[in-house]
């Protein structure tokens, strides 16, 4: 299996650093991408980093990942709580799926406590800020190393 990992970001994450910084922090999505690529290089992972406000684009990237990727690290954002379609797409992916949330969704509004994505995710990281992405990449890399023996 390849060392390719898709890092997928859902709606409004293009506004990271500008939208509700008291919840999501001041780092931008470009900062997150830079950090993911740097860690990926260190861990021997190839990173494909995408963001979309459109559900179908995220689904298309999940379908694309089925053919080539070892893992998906995904912050589905608001689609976490609403998208059976993303869950169905993730259920077609055989690699590792790590769900990431910048904030601790369990300390927030009740509707944020439910995740369709968690029903497929191999792990969920919430409340660690943008470091959650890096933790997710480290987990995928560890599982790949263990699979190699």
UniProtKB/Swiss-Prot annotation:
Residue(s) at site: Transition state stabilizer: 19
Enzymatic reactions: 3-dehydroquinate = 3-dehydroshikimate + H2O
UniProt entry tagged with the keyword Ubl conjugation: no
This protein's pathway: Metabolic intermediate biosynthesis; chorismate biosynthesis; chorismate from D-erythrose 4-phosphate and phosphoenolpyruvate: step 3/7
InterPro entries: DHquinase_II, DHquinase_II_CS, DHquinase_II_sf
EC number, UniProt record: 4.2.1.10
Binding of substrate, residues: 75, 81, 88, 102-103, 112
Quaternary structure and partners: Homododecamer.
Family: Belongs to the type-II 3-dehydroquinase family.
HAMAP family in the cross-refs: AroQ
Protein name: 3-dehydroquinate dehydratase 2
Protein's organism: Bradyrhizobium diazoefficiens (strain JCM 10833 / BCRC 13528 / IAM 13628 / NBRC 14792 / USDA 110)
Designated gene of the protein: aroQ2
């Amino acid at each position: 299996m390849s060392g390719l990992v898709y890092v997928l970001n859902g709606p409004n994450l293009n506004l990271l650093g500008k939208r509700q910084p008291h919840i999501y922090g001041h780092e931008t999505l470009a900062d997150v991408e830079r950090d993911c690529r740097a860690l990926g290089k260190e861990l021997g992972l190839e990173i494909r980093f995408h963001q979309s406000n459109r559900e179908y684009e995220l689904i298309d990237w999940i379908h694309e990942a089925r053919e080539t990727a070892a893992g998906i690290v995904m912050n589905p954002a608001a689609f976490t709580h609403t998208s059976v379609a993303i869950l169905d797409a993730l259920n077609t992916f055989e690699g590792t799926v790590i769900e990431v949330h910048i904030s601790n969704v369990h300390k927030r509004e009740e509707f944020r406590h439910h995740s369709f994505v968690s029903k497929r995710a191999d792990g969920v990281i919430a409340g660690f800020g943008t470091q959650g992405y890096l933790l997710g990449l480290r987990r995928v890399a560890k599982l790949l190393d263990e699979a190699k023996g």
